[in-house]
Amino acid sequence: MPTKSIKIVVEGGNVKPGPPLAPTLSQLGLNVGEVVKKINDATSQFKGMSVPVTLEVDTDTKKYEIKVGIPTTTSLLLKFANASEPSGDPAHKKVGDIKFEDIIQVAIMKKPQITAKTLKAAVKSILGTAHSIGLTVDKKSPKELVKAVDEGKYDDLLAKYEQKWNEAEG
């Protein structure tokens, strides 16, 4: 059973049945409209975000499996901030503000893909991304919050999410 793996990055819930995906699917003898609909259904919870998708196709039987990855950290943060794109000048132009708990949620979602061993370390990593794309967190600079996390000022809040962190795959 030879399989072909197709890796693509799509806009969640908004894949169109055109190039570059359609020609590849057609060559494999797949129904383009059906596959596109299934990808859109599978990624609908990530509307407006860039989502990695892997399509595993059995080239003999034409059966396929859609594996949806986790959107980029930047996409998740921008979604929480209701911002459309990162700042081109994050030091001077802020594009939005999110809650510290949103940072924790993103850290938990991204656990399978980040190297941090603890929730605290993961949160600091996500705060770094928030800083680099021009977001503030609870109206403060993410850099300030990294320092506050190091000083233990968020330990109680982080403790509330430890269970979710430990249950997350990764």
From Swiss-Prot:
Gene3D superfamilies: Ribosomal protein L11, C-terminal domain (1.10.10.250), Ribosomal protein L11/L12, N-terminal domain (3.30.1550.10). GO terms for molecular function: large ribosomal subunit rRNA binding; structural constituent of ribosome. PROSITE patterns: RIBOSOMAL_L11 (PS00359). Signal peptide: none annotated. Keywords: Ribonucleoprotein, Ribosomal protein, RNA-binding, rRNA-binding. NCBIfam families: PRK01143.1. Belongs to the universal ribosomal protein uL11 family. Part of the ribosomal stalk of the 50S ribosomal subunit. Interacts with L10 and the large rRNA to form the base of the stalk. L10 forms an elongated spine to which L12 dimers bind in a sequential fashion forming a multimeric L10(L12)X complex. HAMAP family: Ribosomal_uL11. This is Large ribosomal subunit protein uL11.
